[in-house]
Amino acid sequence: GTVTLPASKSISNRVLIVNALADSELPIENLADCDDTQSMVRILCSENSYFDVGHAGTAMRFLTAYLSRIIGKWVLTGSERMKQRPIRVLVEALNRLGARIGYLENEGFPPLEIYGSRLVGGSIDIPASVSSQYISALLMIAPYMEKGLEIRLTGKVVSSSYIDMTLQIMREFGAEVGREDTVIGVKPGEYRSVPYRVESDWSAASYFYELLAIAGEGEIILTGLKEKSMQGDSRQTVVWRKLGVRTCYEGDLVRLSAAKPEIDRLDYD
């Protein structure tokens, strides 16, 4: 049978921010239907100055950076649980780059009071162990900083594939970016408006690979996946081939078919 997979949440959230910075009226097709994405859509379309993201952690991080360069005074809050999630690393980084962000309740936690302004940018050191969403939040607004941005990641990088995803989306919207291992550079400029269709979620595809591997026969067609995907989970095809599931790309469709496993046991890190 044919399965319509959900859209990638990670790509949807990044494209929403970049598209808003581009001030684009062109459509974004196939957005993810999840709390984070829907919160961001609602807030980005709002004319209010007080925003509540609820439980949406990605929205809190990405919108903190986004609002810091939108002229005006903004309040960004969330659920009681969200108010217990630290955001100091991102806020301090933004303030060093020229933002004006303060805490309305507990130091280092939402809710935040944000005075949107023109950001100077420059060079900044960030611990590589922090959430990749902090790094992505900084990168996405970097073209609009007067000096651009250079991020030097200190220590062992985690979630590198999500940083690369952010950079790829930025390139697709016209940003000049570069990365050499732990140093990421973004030149000052602007995003251009482009129509965009979000690819399907490779992590959701894993369940159907598993079904075929267990069944040992049959085939399944999955929609909306790309062979040259920016999602790190797309590399799972190598693992599933060893476990007896072949992957064949046909345009924006992926045909999975059961085959003889190449191994009896898999140890994979």
Mark where each language-model region is.
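Short, structured segments at the rim of ligand-binding sites
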Residues: 1-269
